[in-house]
Amino acid sequence: MSEIKNEPMSNSDSVASSNSAKMRRKKTNRACNHCHKAHMTCDTNRPCQRCLQRGLESSCQDAPRKRKKYLADVPPNVLSRHDGLSQSPPYEMGKNDTINYQSGPFQERPPSSEFNPPMPTANTDNDINQDFGAFGVYPNSHLFPSNTNQTNQDAGADMSHSQGQSKPPINQHMHQQGLPSYNKPRRTNFLSSAADLEYSTLSSILQDNFVHVNNNTSAEGTPNSLNLSPSVLPNNAPNTNITDSRNTTSSNSLNNYGQQNKPMNYTSGSSHASSPNDSIFNSKQMSSINGINKNKYYYSSKYPKCDESINQYFLGPTGSDHELIYPDVITAIEEMKALDPAVYHERNSKSSLSFTIGIIPESNEYTKGRKPQENKETFKEPDEIYAKVNKPFSYTPGYHSLIAYLRKRFPKEMLVKMAESIAAYRPSFIACTNSLKESDLIFMEQCFQRTLLTYDNFIRVSGTPTIVWRRTGEIAYVGNEFCVLTGWKKEDLLLNTKKFIVELLDDKSVVEYFQLFSKIAFGDFLGATMTECTLLTPKKDVKIRTGCMWTLKRDVFGIPMMIIGNFLPII
């Protein structure tokens, strides 16, 4: 009987031992290399139990995982270091913890010192934290000393916090790496090390594009200068350069930093150019990014406003009673090419020359004080057109004025060529209009004004220099961008005297204009393209080479009604 009772006890012991063994062999997320090859269950210990039993504890390591495609270019040692940081326990910095400013492999930081000089330290911690927070970097308020005149040797000493908290010492390595980082492993933001690596890389790219500070001369900026794109400056403020005072043994205060490196002023027509006596901390004229005045070094330049990172110059209203026009900027660039060729070649080595036109809202004080410069025949609503246009437009005086102007300006040889072109299409115009009644001619003018009113809404938002003229060449509409491009004012082209499109072209372009118009007047319905024409400006010694696109608009009778010309400068 005793033997019979012992049998179930032995069975229960074996079952318990097998259950405990199964509990010990709990699956892990990542097996070692030996268990991975043998497809055996591994555990979280290193060396694992199976490798201890087989005597392979010396080579028991985590099995390598298959790399993702987007991590193909990342070095393996960097990935392994990042995995170690991801598996480390979370660390909370105490009040009296010491920080060693040593860069970690995946900490959110700006590019290394190979391309960047040190950031000027200042006691504007809140501004710095706020600005860098938008780019994914969150510097601690303890990282910047309150005394900006400390030398690099004294920077390693502890500094007292204004609220009794101890300041961490600053190593000299901070001045070599830019922004500091912790020497203790930080907790990653994502459970996946690959995702954390990806977002850290994106943060570095954002910092490199928006807050990059170049150490040496490179294709990304001027020597030892801080470049900021206008997209990150408040109030669409332009940018200039502030030279970094790197050779001093102590980090100067921010006020001295701005005063010592203040460039010359560009005061051509701009009332916002700052004088040397202006206060750098004037709250109405500046706002801070990384402790540096933005509006100040945007307007303080001896050359026109330019985004040097992309070699783009600014045109249009400057916020005062002055407009920067294309001829003035081109003249200033030519002066820079002659007087300061180093700056000229460096800007052009980064990117091709380009221009951007600024727009000021209608509610701005600059636009409130301006009188509307519109044609007497311009209408606001379609009802005005049908109510006020009660007689046809006479084209005969326009042709007589055009012929008189051509005879006064051009020699006989060119007049003969233009007369041949005019003779090819003018008889057709006369024949078409002879069969029309007065009501038809009134309807033609109503169609012209109604079409011009529709095109006005498109031209205002297109941003392309545009001008509209009648089939006689009389200018009927001028876009704002065309005035910025050429320097002509609307009242000079529309209100004061009758102007023709040929008055804005040079001699060769005028001859080509008549030859081309004679071909498209009763030919191609869509229009034509002048590959190149030269525009005249109010300054007789300044001419602008442009590419011109024509769009021919006909009325309901098939007669050319208006020509819309789009001009873009050839840089």
UniProtKB/Swiss-Prot annotation:
GO terms for cellular component: nucleus. SUPFAM superfamilies: Zn2/Cys6 DNA-binding domain. Residues 10-21, 239-256 have a biased composition (Low complexity). InterPro entries: ERT1_acuK_gluconeogen_tf, PAS_13, Zn2-C6_fun-type_DNA-bd_sf, Zn2Cys6_DnaBD. Residues 143-180, 216-238, 257-282 have a biased composition (Polar residues). Residues 403-475 form the PAS domain. It is found in: Nucleus. Signal peptide: none annotated. Its main location: nucleus. Residues 20-48 bind DNA. Transmembrane segments: none annotated. The keyword DNA-binding applies. Residues 1-25, 76-117, 141-187, 216-282 are annotated as: Disordered. SMART domains: GAL4. GO terms for biological process: cellular response to starvation; gluconeogenesis. One of its GO terms (molecular function) is zinc ion binding. Keywords: Activator, DNA-binding, Gluconeogenesis, Metal-binding, Nucleus, Transcription, Transcription regulation, Zinc. Transcription factor which regulates nonfermentable carbon utilization. Activator of gluconeogenetic genes. Belongs to the ERT1/acuK family. This is Transcription activator of gluconeogenesis ERT1.
